[in-house]
Amino acid sequence: MASLQQSRIQSYLEKNKIGPLFEEMMTKLITETPDHPIPFLIGHLQTKQESPGRIQRTLSGSAALWAEGSSEYKGTRRDSRGYEKPWQIHPKKPKKSKSDLAVSNISPPSPESKSLPRSILRPTWDWRTKPESRGFDELNHILLESKKLGKALENLSRSIAVSDDFDLDPRAYNSVLRPRVVGEWVGREEEDLDPLAAEMFQPPVPRAKTEGWTSKDNSPVGSLKMETKGKGLKQQQQNHKKLLAAMLSQDSFDSMPDSAPSVTEDEMEDEDDAMELLEDLDDLRMEGVTGLLQSGSKFSQGRSSYYTEPQAKVTLNICSRCARLQGDSLTARTEEEPERHVPEQAVPEVPCPLPTVTETLTATEDLQTASQVTGLRHPVWASDVKPIRGTSPQTARRALQLQDSLFSKELENMGKHLAEVEKDLAKLAEQGKLNRSPNSPHRSLLLPPLFHTTNTLPVLGQTSRPQSPSSLSSKTTGLPLHNPKPTSLMTDRTSPSNSSSRAQTPSRPITPNSLMMRSFTAAGHGNKERVYGRSRSRPVTPTGQITRPILTPPGLSTTDLYGGLWSTLTEDEFYQQLQAVRKPWRIPSDAESDCLDPPEQDKCEFYTSDPSHSLKTL
């Protein structure tokens, strides 16, 4: 009995396709998830009732499997039914497990993604329903979308109706004359002369929500509607309107000063344009524009930030200008301080006394030497290290340290040169003592290669190039030279004369380079008198030269040279000349000229004690 009833129910379900129908309804509910499921299912069933026989087109995968299983279970009645079973025409699919079936029930694919391939895979479908089924699926989805839009419009109309329920008073609002701005002007009375005064102390929540329920909305219709509304919908609409009001009034109302004048509604309508005009002031400031005019800010009553911000910019500019002026004064002081201290540091006092020399120069020689060596002296390294304008005191301190290091290097170089000169002079002194004996072999070797007659004397106009400074006296000073080429020694042997007569000395200032132009007089060493003239085109500077000073010209040894000089001078005069040579010389900077004295013409002066044999060649 139970089996017969069960078979009858099964046949009824198969005949009316109840199983696939419920499967499809569950699939629709899961995929669409409507807010109101019962009206959604009613609408879905109405669409099925309008088009009978098409339920098999939108079967889900699980419904198709269930239909196949039920058809196999009831295979005995397959031949007795005459209607078509299209889900059995297609070959069987592999059966799914219960977990796969549950997953397919929970998250099935979209209906259009299943229906279109199934229509393609069934070429034997009825020709009357095949084209209509595809169009019906598309139309069905269009209808569903339209229903969604209709629901959204319905919700919007409800929210508008709620706000309109409080506008039953004809004085409250006129939607034709004024545009509706949610959160700003809804429910505002026209007698309110200062509509923004109350909004300064609280966010601009629509007054229809606060005041309308208590004082304005006393009509029974409005109160009845408000009572029928659910609290959830009212809370949602209120929150939404609060958010809109805060967004709309953030720029124009939050930063308004308390003492703002009353604004008419015409001015408020023009306020948006004024905001548009003043919107790009911040952009202009970011681009570096400083002279912004504040005349246009009177159109915007709610932009108080524009009043204070340019003032802050102006004070910053003034402060930066003052800082620049103070920085200039500080750097000027730092420039003056190194210039004050550099001349004291730059003049080196290098005492170079000979161990055995006790005599000093005469007063005139000392004055001339001092005027040449230290009289015209400038700071040596002032051109190398200059303070940069606008630098910090740390930079000036570094510049002073650099000057000290350069000064110490120059002193080291001078000390090296002076040590070499001292060595050479010590050797010369020993050789001079040996050559003082009359039987010394060096005296006979000196005169033939050194001295020429006046017939072989070169004249400046006849020489192909100016005479280089590597002459006799410049070799004895121990200075490094520019050009080590040998030049002819312009000396002459003069006739015998009175031994007490003095040769004329040139009237040139005494420098370390020109000291040897002074005449060497012989007192008590025979009746011969030799005057050495020196030719030079320009003076010799010790900077930028070769490291090892060339003390003697090629082909001439210092022993021979000073042996000849020692034979004509007394010991005291010889040491006096050496002491004059040992005076410190000037070290010019790289930027200065390498000439200490103005270039003069080469002079060769030859004097004798006899006026008849006097010869002067220019």
Swiss-Prot record:
Give the superkingdom in one word. Eukaryota
Composition bias of kind Basic and acidic residues appears in 74-84, 333-343
- What are the Low complexity biased-composition ranges? 463-481
Start-end of Polar residues biased regions: 485-516, 609-618
Task: Give me the ranges of the annotated region Disordered.
Answer: 70-118, 330-352, 456-552, 587-618
Coiled coil regions, renumbered to chain:
none
Show the stretches that span the lipid bilayer: none
Official protein name in the record: Uncharacterized protein C8orf34 homolog
Q: Which organism is it from?
A: Danio rerio (Zebrafish)
